[in-house]
Amino acid sequence: LSTATLYDKVWALHQVAELPSGATQLFIGLHLIHEVTSPQAFAALKDLGLSVRHPERTVATVDHIVPTTSQARPFADGLAEEMLSTLERNCQENGIHLNGLGSGRQGIVHVMAPELGLTQPGMTVACGDSHTSTHGAFGAIAFGIGTSQVRDVLASQSLTMNKLKVRRIWVDGALQPGVFAKDLVLHIIRTLGVKGGVGYAYEFAGPAIEALSMEERMTLCNMAIEGGARCGYVNPDQTTFDYLKGRPHAPSGEAWDRAVSWWKSLASGADACFDDEVKLDAATIAPTITWGITPGQGIGVDEAVPTLEQTPEEDRPLAQEAYRYMDLQPGQAIAGLPVDVCFIGSCTNGRLSDLRAAASIAAGRQVASGIKAFVVPGSEQVAAAAEAEGLDAVFRQAGFEWREPGCSMCLAMNPDRLEGRQISASSSNRNFKGRQGSASGRTLLMSPAMVAAAAITGHVTDVRSLPPA
């Protein structure tokens, strides 16, 4: 149908059955698992006497709990060691491929699968992780799921789901120098709110989206969930195909040509019907940073913390809570705010282009006195590629630590944590209270280049004022 969106087409192709409840049983083409949300699912499977239905459609890695300073086994943290050992055993017993530490293919699950060509247009992808929407960058429909649903996918390769509405977010114009996909998505969430996408899939489209690289599209789709959307996607195009070609799991030869012509047919048609549409202009977006305790509490780096009068009535209680927790005054400029810790990495911004952008700001400069700054590549492949380019040396010479791959300080499940009231400049995706490991720690979300600028100056700084080396 020319009125069908990509979401409609992919949904229809994966529909196993309509259930009496009105929900759909949806086939899952690719199931990604990791050490945190899979152990209970495997245990439940065993209790039920069930086996993994499609081990060949299941791929595992380890990311959340791994230390980034030394990955020697056994880990100092006994629980982390137990979680990894359990994953290794579950994969071995069930014939599931594990991209483990030192394999050359380990990484944060949402960095690892795309770079190996596992994620492809037209797929349904599920993973027991909130930020599975990342894979929508390829024109896939990708959902984060809970542990009981991980069990269901292992057992049946399908999920019970209700079909979403589709909102197209059309972005005209071009992003200005120093403004990245991270700024764009923070701007979108600021504009539509953290609950604005509830019940929706977001289709990102328009000239500004088409101009994004695949890695930038992954950043954008990664944070669709932070705007309340269940998933976000970009229609596959030549950028998608060029990225996938030659990757280990991508089709090759004649199968490649067939795949590309099939992938092209999936894009939303010119007459596609959307349930809602929002239009934005990329040229008006400044480097954007969160000031509060949700990803929706964002402002341009050249703006001030909003006053209550500038805040919609329903958002005022949260704004007051954020002023108190963050120790900020309404009307206070965000530029110049001192930071303690600078973290570059995560499934949002731990890819090679992110590290290049940050390194271009760090090159020839020095991390400010008293600032702890560190870089955590998103995968072993990203680390190897960055080291081959000498990016690790650029960071080290500037005074950053260069770490081993993992989720690191995005979340408090490994040794990388804030202490006390420390404030971090972070390229990750969530700034909730306590998210980075200290119950009173504070997080400012921003692009990797902005984090690098904060590390060099010791405070929130407009990256556009620091010309790249």
Task: Mark where each language-model region is.
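Fe-S-dependent hydro-lyases/dehydratases of central metabolism
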Residues: 1-469
